[in-house]
Regions:
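Interfacial/linker helices and their anchor residues that mediate assembly or domain coupling
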Residues: 79-117
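A short, Lys/Arg-rich alpha-helix, primarily the initiator
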Residues: 1-22
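Alpha-helical residues within the helix-turn-helix
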Residues: 21, 32, 65
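Short alpha-helical DNA-recognition segment
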Residues: 24-47
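DNA major-groove recognition helix of helix-turn-helix
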Residues: 34, 45, 49, 59, ...
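DNA major-groove recognition helix of helix-turn-helix/homeodomain DNA-binding modules
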Residues: 52, 56-73
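Residue-level signal for the short linker/turn that defines the boundary of a DNA-recognition helix
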Residues: 14, 24-25, 40, 55-58
Length: 117
């Protein structure tokens, strides 16, 4: 298995667990809310959170919807990017477009230079 696959699984696992806990849901509650069988719901979510198994895209999308977070949040590779995705996700589509335009304008004013931490 490639390192990037392991990293992506680990990121998804960490963000899933944090979002589920923030939502106040048990693993079983989350699993059943996304259509997993009641008998295996907790085990499946636990395996996703432990990074043992990958959720397929359709399941990951249902999980994100159930948790009220954008799908991209679950895969964001930095905390800052994850926070930005969550924040943008709270805005209406028109507000999202304006926020992105504002960010692009700020970047253009800075001459396209970006500081990396």
């Amino acid at each position: 298995m490639a390192q990037t696959e392991v990293d992506a699984r680990s990121i998804f696992a960490q963000r899933l667990k944090a979002a589920r806990e923030d939502a106040g849901l048990t693993q079983k509650e989350l699993g059943t809310s996304v259509g997993l069988p009641q008998e295996t719901a907790a085990v499946r979510i636990n395996r996703y959170e432990k990074g043992v198994h990958d959720a397929d895209l359709a399941t990951a999308r249902r999980i994100a919807q159930s948790l009220g977070v954008p799908l991209a949040f679950l895969y964001a590779d930095t905390d800052v990017l994850a926070e930005a995705i969550l924040t943008l996700g709270l805005l209406s589509k028109s507000e999202q477009r304006k926020a992105v335009a504002d960010l692009k304008a700020r970047l253009a004013q800075a001459g396209g230079a970006v500081e990396k931490d």
